[in-house]
Swiss-Prot record:
Induction: By nickel. It is found in: Secreted; Bacterial flagellum. Keywords: Bacterial flagellum, Secreted. It comes from Bacillus cereus. This is Flagellin. Belongs to the bacterial flagellin family. Flagellin is the subunit protein which polymerizes to form the filaments of bacterial flagella.
Amino acid sequence: MRINTNINSM
């Protein structure tokens, strides 16, 4: 898991 400013469903 990365910390990004994106909308992802984890």
